[in-house]
Amino acid sequence: MTEEVYQNLQKHLDQFPIGYPATKTGVEIRVLQHLFTPEEAEIAINLKLAYETLENIHKNIENHISLAELEIALDTMVSKGLINFKREGENKYYAIIPLVVGIYEYQVDKLTKEFIEDFEQYKDNEFALELLSTKNLQFRVIPLEQSLTPENLVASYDELRKIIENIEEDSIGLTKCICRQSKDLQGQPCSKTSERELCLYFGNTGRLFLDQGWARPINKDETLELLRKAEKDGLVLQSGNTKDPEFICCCCECCCGILSKAKDIPRPAQFLASNYYAEVDKELCTGCGTCLERCQMNALKLVNNISKVNLKRCIGCGLCVSTCPEEAIHLRKKETEVVPPSTVDDLYAEIAQIKEELRQKMKK
């Protein structure tokens, strides 16, 4: 019976846009067992991606649990980073969340070696295929400020300063990078930076992190300073793929599950949303190789002592631009602009549509 409740939870999670596919090894069940008690798994099966009130959730649960008992259980699940939560006035709202971005990121300061071992196995196999099947539209690359030239008409969702300006300052939470925490526990510390507080959350998610003590508050000026330092350290800025993102992470290919997976495939440019690509001025390039060292996607190589960009691999982050001593590289805007969805709900709807189109193609 205990095994069955986790199997039911796996099926429940798998029906959402960011699914939770089954495996032959059962590792996906072990991941859930690390996180949920059987009682919590039973409750989670009754939750939706859309926020619901405590009272509505109680109506959906068949087992005999009082409203007060359910509230305690849900609040415990929130504190464990298993579900989403927000408060509006006196009302409390709860929702299910996917494994990524969601449950995994909410495990900051709660990781164990046993969980990491099973999570890594799942992440590198069936779950990786799940993310790849959606082209990973949960993420977009924000180009470095100094890499954008005046002739580039930069949309607000591509301009770091505008993104931060639009955020409510009391919702900004700075937390430790879950990917680097995981690598530290595995004895594989980050090769790019010794910093660990490198993930920012905003809006409802930021308030959740702050309320739960998973993050500390910082202001907008501190936020911009942190992100600019991350750029200097050679980190790629990735945000949620919405017009007003609820997170920005400072990423590297040695720790970040998304960037490392992108680097492993032939065409990272198709895997990460970005509106830019790097272009080299052959007349100015001296072949010093600085850009090759900065690029995390192996998108640059020297041909006849001149840097050449592989457009299939370039994700438009601008790391190569900001440190070119000859100013021979600049970012060029793509002809077709990728406009992010307005909200997370719109994002999930877009991902669901892409997955359905793929299913229909596979049937033919």
Where do the language-model regions lie?
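Short amphipathic alpha-helical interface segments
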Residues: 35-60
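Iron-sulfur cluster-binding cysteine motifs and their immediate structural context
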Residues: 52, 56, 60, 82-86, ...
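Long, low-complexity, charged/polar intrinsically disordered regions in eukaryotic proteins
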Residues: 1-29
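Catalytic cores of enzyme domains
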Residues: 125-277
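Short amphipathic alpha-helical interaction segments
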Residues: 63-79
